Amino acid sequence: MKNNIILVILLGISVFVDCLPLNDQEEDKSLNAQESEVSAVQKRDILQFSGMIRCATGRSAWKYFNYGNWCGWGGSGTAVDGVDSCCRSHDWCYKRHDSCYPKIIPYIASTSGSHPSCSITCHSANNRCQRDVCNCDKVAAECFARNTYHPNNKH
């Protein structure tokens, strides 16, 4: 229950943060013609994952909370579909990188375009842990985009 409350708070913050304007330095970068297609360059922790999901799928991260047997905090049993398998793989990826504190480590990533032409990049300035966690999130978001979302699997 405590973990679910924390996730709800984090997802709520992510919705708020995704609505905030970029800071002045990032706004200046967005004016550069070479970077005009980049919709966001942000340094965040688990909240960054929600931006990747939005870009890759066109859906809010909320749609994936309590979906199937694996989406949300924890998970067990058999994956109910491809989306749920993405969540299971994401959980296992975080587990492989547990020493990096994947739920809280900040990393730098950028998204450009939007669903269905989203591009997600994990920045080269990330250290090993940041790169690994960023890639866990990127792979999961792209996996969500490749699989059919079934609303009846959300509970």
Curated annotation (Swiss-Prot):
Listed under catalytic activity are:
a 1,2-diacyl-sn-glycero-3-phosphocholine + H2O = a 1-acyl-sn-glycero-3-phosphocholine + a fatty acid + H(+)
Active site annotation, chain numbering: 90, 137
For binding Ca(2+), which residues are annotated in this chain's numbering? 72, 74, 91
Annotated signal peptide:
1-19
State the compartments where it is located. Answer: Secreted; Nematocyst
List the propeptide residues: 20-42
Q: Which GO terms describe its biological process?
A: arachidonate secretion; lipid catabolic process; phospholipid metabolic process
The record, for SMART domains, names:
PA2c
GO molecular function annotations of the record:
calcium ion binding; calcium-dependent phospholipase A2 activity; phospholipid binding; toxin activity
Q: What is its EC number?
A: 3.1.1.4
**Cofactor descriptive note:** Binds 1 Ca(2+) ion.
Chief subcellular location equals: secreted
**Claim: Cell cycle is one of the keywords in the record:** no
* Disulphide-bonded residues: 55-118, 71-87, 86-143, 93-136, 100-129, 122-134
What keywords does the record list, in alphabetical order? Calcium, Cleavage on pair of basic residues, Disulfide bond, Hydrolase, Lipid degradation, Lipid metabolism, Metal-binding, Nematocyst, Secreted, Signal, Toxin
Cofactor(s) of this protein: Ca(2+)
**Which GO cellular component terms are attached?**
extracellular region; nematocyst
> What biological function has been recorded for the protein in this entry?
PLA2 catalyzes the calcium-dependent hydrolysis of the 2-acyl groups in 3-sn-phosphoglycerides.
Q: What other remark does the UniProt record contain for this protein?
A: Lacks hemolytic activity on bovine red blood cells as well as neurotoxic activities. mRNA is obtained from a single animal, whereas the protein is isolated from exudates of several specimens.
What is stated as this protein's family in its record?
Belongs to the phospholipase A2 family.
* Name by which UniProt lists this protein: Phospholipase A2 A2-actitoxin-Ucs2a
Q: Which organism is it from?
A: Urticina crassicornis
